[in-house]
């Protein structure tokens, strides 16, 4: 867990490992289409603009999904990286009320990939589901 207010900084190794694990578990073609696209996507949350965890998460999801840095599995990789960012920063994502969180998350990510959600809308979805770990 980070000290103070700093959030975990994702690495290229984190991204490659997450991608390879998702391909191994669920299938698809392994490989990186563009290292620069992956580095750009995982670096975007750390620009000075994204200070809160849900803001970092929204930038990460939008970039990993939109940049298509991997041959296959970009949405799955983005979700794994989001959970890694949250966990290592001392946060977790939780469902709201009676929400089926897995289904809500799937619909959310598919909506991002389809271009149906802006970055502020992504942030608005994450904000109430972002909880600091005890």
Annotate the PLM regions.
Residues 1-134:
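FIC/Doc superfamily catalytic core
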């Amino acid at each position: 867990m980070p000290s103070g207010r700093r959030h975990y900084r994702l690495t290229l190794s984190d991204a490659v490992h997450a991608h390879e694990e998702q391909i191994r578990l669920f299938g698809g073609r392994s490989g990186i289409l563009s290292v620069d696209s992956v580095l750009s996507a995982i670096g975007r949350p750390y620009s000075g603009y994204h200070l809160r965890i849900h803001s970092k998460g929204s930038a990460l999801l939008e970039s990993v999904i939109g940049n298509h840095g991997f041959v296959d599995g970009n949405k799955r990789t983005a979700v794994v990286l989001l959970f890694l960012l949250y966990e290592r920063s001392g946060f977790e994502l939780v469902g709201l009320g009676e929400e089926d969180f897995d289904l809500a998350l799937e619909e959310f990510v598919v909506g991002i990939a389809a271009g149906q959600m802006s970055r502020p809308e992504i942030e608005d979805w994450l904000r109430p589901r972002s909880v600091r770990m005890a």
